[in-house]
Amino acid sequence: RQKLATPYWVTYQYSKELQSQPIHTTTHAGQEFDLVVKGTLRVRVGEHEEVLHEGDSIFYKSSTPHGMIAVGGEECTLYAVVMRPQKEKKPEKDTFEALIKAKQDRADHETVASPFVHTELDENGILKSIDFMNEEKFNFAFDIVDKMAEKEPDKLAMLWVSKHHEEKRFTFNDMKRMSNKTANYFKSLGIKRGDRVMLILKRHYQFWFAILALHKLGAVVIPATNLLMEHDLDYRFKAAGVRALVCTPDGQVADEALRAAKNCGTVEFLMMANGAREGWLDFDAEVEKQSDVFERTEDTACGSDPMLMFFTSGTTGYPKIAEHNYKYALGHYITAKYWHNVNPEGLHFTISDTGWGKALWGKLYGQWMCEAPIFTYDFDKFDAHDILPMFKQYNITTFCAPPTMYRFFIKEDLSKYDLSSIEYSTTAGEALNPEVYEQWKRATGLSIYEGFGQTETTLSIYNPVGSVPKSGSMGIPSPLYDVDLILPDGTPAPVGETGEIVIRTDKHTPCGLFMGYYRDEEKTREAWSGGVYHTGDTAWRDEDGYFFYVGRTDDVIKSSGYRIGPFEIESVIMELPYVLECAVTSAPDPIRGQVVKASIVLTKGTQGTEALKKEIQTYVKTNTAPYKYPRIVEFRDELPKTISGKIRRVELKG
């Protein structure tokens, strides 16, 4: 891994169709030297294009967008040498001293969360312990949002930007007033404590009005994505007993929901925000008519009462329903303060859509408990060119996105964008490839602080503020959870050995851990029994206690007595400049039991040849233990995925 350069033989097939199209470009770390051995090549580097013939060569910085196609009516073969960047010392924004000072400056600040949360830091400024008080009386909407409206009514709660770049600024007083009006509207319909209400609102600002209103009413919130189709919604309506739906008019989801609701006997109220349509109640118009006073009562839902349901995005079978109580919000205090490192005077941007649990990690609970405003961009489709200028435009200070988004960012020429406002960057949702971490750090001076959690939990493993993250590691256990690694026989996994990540609950059930799977005692017992919650994810830990992700328990490959995790192999393959996406699974083998199989999506214009397969296999052999190399390599146009974007490995096995 210390070698300075990697050589490749690359063949571009001639395509008549590509001759009239703009050359597709990509980026990667380091520098590149290309020598044409046979044929003719048109090369684009940045805004510059030229044609190379046999014997011609070109040398360029490969972080500049570049691409090439064969011209002249025949295939072109070239010898490419990719030179890895040297580890250069440069000023870093997230120096240990700076992070500790920032944390200490905020440590003694009395917040609206103080009556409920007590924390202790160690001598290095890293979170040592967290305890909760009065949690059985806790209701986030009343105890945090309404208290902030009393304390600082004009403080910014959310800066919202529409897909047309129209801006709206909402203060905490706005959030209190509009959530009260919305609660009164729901109440007028007869929606009450315990009723299940689904929200399909993308990143519309009405989502925040609705979820806070439902928390005040005691109704159970079910966030859902606008990507659902009729059969998805039909299952969800029936499985959860959904009584009401607030929906976006965007796309086709409203039509899908209307058809599904007609087949389901439980859905009584269909409300549409941001528009009016036949068959739907006009959410915006009706809310505006209501009183902005809604008082807390002695029997207001709180503590252990059900508050929230998420449909898990499992890769096999129908999704389960993870149910959370009102203490779930408290579990996200660590998420915001000790992982996102939010600044009450800054602006936090978590990119997730409200249909996913990750949105509540970064767009609501923890951030507002820390009195930090959030930034929301209500876009339709992710576009790095669209989002990157916003960091400077809106002075965004902390940022969280899944690794996929960072991968899109680093393929751009980041030198064109002013990212200097960003003080801290984090990621979760999938394992972070080391190559992405290194390229982002070189471009911005910022480490990416990885974290791990599930729909059933809050942040359970993380790289905390004040620590020095290890590239490729998802971090250390959060003090909120008693996290362990166990072998199949239930004994603790030794250092360096793969085990399943579990959370021990024999001493106490932490705020943030789910109540169980709704209406499914069997699945709940399978995952959580004997004082142990099984995550189904595997990892290994080093001598410093840092965890390194391996894969799902059913994704581990058992070949010739070896246990092989897919993520390490995927990370190596992702280092190759022509690989856009990959997934590693198992395939049956009569001699070895299983062998490693790599399913790969190539960058546009790259041909999946037998020679390229051998090159990939050789690269993996060279850069990791040889027994891990993929004996089967297949090229695909795309990888099968769940609605939430997780790769369906079960479809790739075999």
Regions found by a protein language model. Give the residues of each.
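Gly/Ser/Thr-rich phosphate-binding loop
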Residues: 285, 369, 396-401, 410-470, ...
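Conserved AMP-binding/adenylate-forming core of the ANL superfamily
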Residues: 154, 158-212, 229-234, 284-288, ...
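Conserved AMP-binding A3 loop
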Residues: 168-173, 299, 307-331
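Conserved pre-ATP/AMP-binding loop-to-beta segment of ANL
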Residues: 153-156, 271-272, 278, 288-311, ...
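Structural core segment of the AMP-binding/adenylate-forming
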Residues: 104-105, 188, 212, 216-285, ...
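AMP-binding/adenylate-forming catalytic core of the ANL superfamily
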Residues: 228-238, 245-250, 399, 505-510, ...
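Conserved AMP-binding/adenylation subdomain of ANL enzymes
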Residues: 330-350, 354-397, 412
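ATP-dependent adenylate-forming carboxylate-activation enzymes
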Residues: 201-202, 219-237, 249-256, 352-354, ...
